[in-house]
């Protein structure tokens, strides 16, 4: 019986997008683990999850020692690792973010006070290149854990849902996500009444969201996001049922595990009698450091009063003190609608925003919200400096790289400084996802962009502060963002009073409110829509009306922050003289060899003569980067002389033919394959300076017009001006004089 293999599956119906089958299997692989499960997505993506517990508890710890590891195997995608040793090394960013996605809903589902080490190891064994494995891994982790005989209130179901062509699609593929307006991972569990309690959400808009909305798609507003959470619930229910079906056949009975409660009731009661009034008073101090100093003083008084009666129970006194603090903070918010620092529930702390915070860098900004202070720094470079990714994902390069640093001094402490921890990687990824939807395309802005967020001071949501600082820093660097993005952290506190649950949403939470609340969520977005959202809750479900009201409250705060940021900077600045100038030129593919020359002789000579840096793409696009614009132009002229000998230059005149008219001007063909724009403001000159309402009243398709090239932009687009004969005669007369 022990070696018998058991199966269960969930079939997800996506209507016109087809079905997805998630199959769970146990009893065939990793039989010595306490619990093991294999999750398949459509039989060609396979994730093995093994959950193991230590035999003895670590009773000296004051936290639950759960670790989650995701092992990406390159063989899963038919690859050999690209490293020197041709072996998998440190986990990729995708793997680390998946670890966090698994940890967040699973950790609060274990019995409180558990101190046995629990390790969940996920191995990605096979991957369809069009699939995303992260949600499969969350389900696999939950399944192996409920089979392991641990005190765990699972199962937990997780799905990715994306809004594609007006429909919420579960487990979308990479191909389908190209048309998605919004994409989110949702995890939850089924309650006794059959409803689904949402536990964790990680959501974002996509690179194409703005264009799709322009083309008529529905913008991902707060209402749409709430609808997406509801759409995910039936899928989560089906996944939980499949895991429960498997557990009913193969789960081990729940073992006896010692529970180490933080404190006994007698300690809490004695502490409450001893210091409640002093603690209440301390919690009214607005400043973080002053408040914490007073809280430490009250804690010492509590220890002095209680230790004679509770000798050797110092840890319990400390834990009870924290619990009493939490209780008092929550009571004050629920009853008086007043928070730790004296603010009302919707008040935002004092905001400050400035750009050009440090010299010489390509772009910088400083954003402050109360005691949270973030420095954003932008660096621009050639596209060949973008990050190369050797992962299981089909995405092989990343043009926008967002790094987040959280030094220990930001909270007035000492600690390790060095390579980023999982938390820093997670915060950087959240800020990155918030900004990506508003970035210009590679064609519009051919630069690799590195954004660094330095958390110089922390007291509540440095990740959302990073979004604000990054937006301003990018604009300061001259990056033409499609819209400004701001972020805010929200909290939710609930309490049952007279048999009815009361909810209070808090805007701009402090670090302490984050720890003491029932839910925290971070929302970033533009004035029009949400670009990123992260939600974690300890509640067994949030009423839809409460969530909708909290999201609206977050939107009001975001709009206020955007106004403050706009006062500091609202349009892209001129690029820094220290930033490289990058222009593009297109050449015929059959001319690439001539530009490179034998053994690279020609391209090396151009680079040496002009000081420019040249990158050639396979499609004939050439990126020219240089410290000065004149160097880049010199390289462009040399390349055009080789590959585009008929390429027009500024100041040259042509008798062109109008090939197309639009509301903003006329496109004029100068030579085969080379058109320029004669803007409506220039067409006025052909109408004697009169206002032109309709371009075709002056220039129709097929009309001949004498034009001069006024400007060639960084993408090679031509701007034209008309040549007026009378004006030319006047210029000649002036010259003769």
UniProtKB/Swiss-Prot annotation:
One of its GO terms (biological process) is mRNA catabolic process. Involved in mRNA degradation. Catalyzes the phosphorolysis of single-stranded polyribonucleotides processively in the 3'- to 5'-direction. It catalyses: RNA(n+1) + phosphate = RNA(n) + a ribonucleoside 5'-diphosphate. It is an enzyme of class 2 (transferase). Pfam families: KH_1, PNPase, RNase_PH, S1. The gene is pnp. Keywords: Cytoplasm, Magnesium, Metal-binding, Nucleotidyltransferase, RNA-binding, Transferase. Residues 651-723 form the S1 motif domain. One of its GO terms (cellular component) is cytosol. Belongs to the polyribonucleotide nucleotidyltransferase family. Its EC number is 2.7.7.8. Residues 580-639 form the KH domain. GO terms for molecular function: 3'-5'-RNA exonuclease activity; magnesium ion binding; polyribonucleotide nucleotidyltransferase activity; RNA binding. This is Polyribonucleotide nucleotidyltransferase. It is found in: Cytoplasm. SUPFAM superfamilies: Eukaryotic type KH-domain (KH-domain type I) (SSF54791), Polynucleotide phosphorylase/guanosine pentaphosphate synthase (PNPase/GPSI), domain 3 (SSF46915), Ribonuclease PH domain 2-like (SSF55666), Ribosomal protein S5 domain 2-like (SSF54211). The keyword RNA-binding applies.
């Amino acid at each position: 019986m022990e070696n018998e293999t058991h199966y269960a599956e969930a079939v997800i119906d996506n209507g016109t997008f087809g079905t997805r089958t998630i199959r769970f299997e146990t009893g065939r692989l990793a039989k010595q683990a306490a619990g093991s499960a294999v999750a398949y997505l459509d039989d060609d993506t396979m994730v093995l999850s093994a959950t193991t517990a230590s035999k003895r508890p670590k009773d000296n710890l004051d936290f639950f020692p759960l670790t989650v590891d995701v092992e990406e195997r390159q063989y899963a995608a038919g690859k050999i690792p690209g490293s020197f040793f041709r072996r998998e090394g440190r986990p990729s960013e995708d793997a680390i973010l998946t670890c966090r996605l698994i940890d967040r809903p699973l950790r609060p589902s274990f019995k409180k006070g558990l101190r046995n080490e629990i390790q969940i190891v996920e191995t990605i064994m096979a991957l369809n290149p069009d699939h995303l494995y992260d949600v499969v891994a969350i389900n696999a982790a939950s399944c192996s854990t409920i089979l392991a005989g641990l005190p765990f209130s699972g199962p937990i179901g997780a799905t990715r849902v994306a809004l594609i062509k007006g429909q919420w699609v579960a487990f979308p593929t990479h191909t389908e996500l190209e048309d998605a307006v919004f994409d989110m991972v949702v995890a939850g569990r089924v309650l006794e009444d059959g409803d689904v309690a949402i536990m964790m959400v990680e959501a974002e808009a996509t690179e194409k969201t703005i264009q799709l909305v322009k083309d008529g798609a529905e913008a991902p507003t707060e209402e749409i996001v709430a609808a997406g959470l509801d759409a995910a619930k039936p899928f989560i229910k089906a996944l939980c049922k499949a895991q429960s079906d498997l557990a009913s056949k193969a789960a081990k009975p729940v073992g006896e595990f010692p529970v180490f409660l933080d404190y006994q009731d007698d300690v809490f009661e004695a502490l409450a009698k001893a210091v409640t009034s002093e603690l209440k008073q301390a919690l009214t101090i607005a400043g973080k450091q002053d408040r914490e100093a007073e809280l430490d003083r009250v804690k010492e008084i509590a220890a002095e009063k209680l230790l004679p009666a509770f000798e050797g129970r110092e840890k319990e006194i400390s834990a009870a003190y924290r619990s009493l603090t939490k209780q008092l903070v929550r009571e004050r918010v629920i009853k008086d609608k007043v928070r730790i620092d004296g603010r009302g529930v919707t008040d935002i702390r004092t905001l400050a925003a400035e750009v050009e915070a440090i010299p010489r860098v390509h772009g910088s900004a400083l954003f402050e919200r109360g005691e949270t202070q973030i420095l954003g720094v932008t660096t621009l470079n050639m596209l060949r400096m973008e990050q190369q990714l050797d992962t299981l994902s089909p995405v092989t390069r990343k043009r926008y790289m967002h790094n987040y640093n959280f030094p220990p001094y930001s909270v007035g402490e000492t600690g390790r400084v060095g390579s980023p921890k999982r938390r820093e990687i997670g915060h950087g990824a959240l800020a990155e996802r918030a900004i990506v939807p508003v970035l210009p395309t590679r064609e519009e802005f051919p630069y690799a962009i590195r954004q660094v967020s330095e958390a110089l001071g922390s007291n509540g949501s440095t990740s959302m502060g990073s979004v604000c600082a990054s937006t301003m820093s990018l604009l300061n660097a001259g990056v033409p963002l499609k819209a400004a993005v701001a972020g805010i952290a929200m909290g939710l506190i609930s309490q049952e009073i007279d048999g009815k649950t009361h909810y209070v949403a808090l805007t701009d939470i402090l670090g302490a409110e984050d720890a003491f609340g029932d839910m925290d969520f971070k929302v970033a977005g533009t004035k029009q829509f949400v670009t990123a959202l992260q939600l974690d809750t300890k509640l067994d479900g949030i009423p839809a009306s409460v969530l909708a009201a909290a999201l609206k409250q977050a939107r009001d705060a975001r709009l206020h922050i955007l106004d403050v940021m706009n006062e500091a900077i609202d349009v892209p600045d001129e690029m820094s003289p220290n930033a490289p100038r990058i222009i593009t030129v297109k050449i015929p593919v059959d001319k690439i060899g001539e530009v490179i020359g034998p053994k690279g002789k020609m391209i090396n000579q151009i680079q040496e003569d002009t000081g420019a840096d040249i990158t050639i793409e396979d499609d004939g696009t050439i990126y020219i980067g240089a410290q000065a614009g004149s160097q880049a132009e010199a390289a462009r002229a040399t390349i055009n002389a080789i590959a585009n000998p008929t390429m027009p230059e500024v100041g040259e005149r042509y008798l062109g033919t109008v090939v197309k008219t639009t509301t903003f001007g006329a496109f004029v063909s100068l030579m085969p394959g080379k058109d320029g724009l004669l803007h409506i403001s220039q067409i006025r000159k052909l109408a004697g300076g009169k206002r032109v309402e309709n371009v075709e009243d002056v220039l129709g398709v097929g009309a001949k017009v004498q034009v001069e090239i006024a400007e060639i932009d960084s993408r090679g687009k031509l701007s034209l001006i008309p040549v007026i004969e009378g004006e030319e005669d006047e210029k000649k007369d002036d010259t003769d004089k």
